[in-house]
Amino acid sequence: MRAASIALPLILVAAACASGQTPAAATTYRDATATHVPPAPELHALDAAFTDVDGDDDLDVVVAVEGGANRLYLNDGRGRLTWREGAFGTAAHDSEHVLAADFDRDGLLDVIFVAEDDMAHAFFLGAPGGRFVDATERLPARSEGNGLAVGDVNGDGLPDVVVGNSGSRAGRSGQNFLWLSDAARPGHFVDATAASLPAVDDDTQGVALADLDGDGDLDMVVANENPPNRLLLNDGRGRFTEHPERLDLRVPLETRQAHVFDATGDGAPDVLFLNLTSNAGRREKDPRMRLLVNDGRGAFRDESEARLPATTFSTWAGTPVDFDGDGDLDLVVGAIDVPGFRPMRVRAYENDGSGRYTDATDRVIPPETVGRSWGMAVGDLDGDGIEDIFIGGWGTQARLLLGSGGSR
């Protein structure tokens, strides 16, 4: 029986070659979308977060939806997702981002969404049985939100919230928000914006929290649609001060996301900006990714030309992930052709271990992953110990890429 099981693939390969067909080369990721993700080819799935909603020890998927109700996809333990309709209500909103954390300290993960045009941010408390209770009234304010980050910024052990605001419409402010968890009432928030953030009317699309200067607290990188991007240092108590002298911004950028991770392997976090040429309009700015390398003391120098391939597509989202299992962080990014807003194949860039990246798309990403790729989430969905990627889509099918032995 073993000999037969080995011989059959060889026969199939030989038959394919004899007929003039070349077998498709295997890629690091397998596109499991058709069998594992609920079909929704016109959905605007702008972001996703992985969290074990129902306590069965696998990762479920929470999806932020623009122009529809936010979604919950339950995992069967093998990465096959089923839509639990109405988990976050049925009202349509303009949700842009989603994150999960245990805000009320009950051991169950809660979910926060930020919304743009309708300013309908939403907050749901996790409940037993994989259910959620709407607690949106606990959020301190409404805004035209486009960025979201969660982390303990004041050292009290509770998750706090940063909302990045765009203020692109008349009468709306681009002042970003800082909401501190209320230690006296876990699951409630105190608006610390006025006392803790610079008073700046920005056009923020993304926010990242990380210890940039090595002092043990969470600092902030702000990604803006209109320049400049910003670096804010934390005083340890959750009060932030901008330090533009630490951020080497050599060209004007229209940035959608900031990622903070150790690209160069020196133990210090670096900053990656994912950029557009314009928001689906004409060609304006250089959309190539920018990698700013930490000098070890919290100052960041733009070394993009030496470390990243030149590209011309626009990128609304991406993620660092070790897809080749060598211990350093590679990159998977969405690509959209602008002008035109035309869908493109997802792209992959391999890290050589020192922060120099080469295009590995053909070896890593299945060719059918063409779409307007949006927010991504990374985690082991199918329980094989290997990280997978859920990729949102703007008016194209959200995708699930299952990792193989090379992606850990």
Mark where each language-model region is.
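Acidic carboxylate motifs that coordinate Ca2+ or other divalent cations, activating on Asp/Glu
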Residues: D56, D60, D106, D110, ...
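Beta-rich catalytic cores
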Residues: H44, G68, D94-E96, E144-A149, ...
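Blade-level signature of beta-propeller repeat domains, shared across WD40, Kelch, NHL, RCC1
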Residues: G375-R408
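Beta-propeller blade termini
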Residues: L46-G55, E96-R105, G145-G155, Q205-G214, ...
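Hydrophobic beta-strand segments that make up the repeating blades of beta-propeller
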Residues: L59-V65, V111-A115, V161-S166, M220-N224, ...
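Short glycine/acidic-enriched loop and turn motifs that connect beta-strands
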Residues: G68, D117-M119, G167-A170, P227, ...
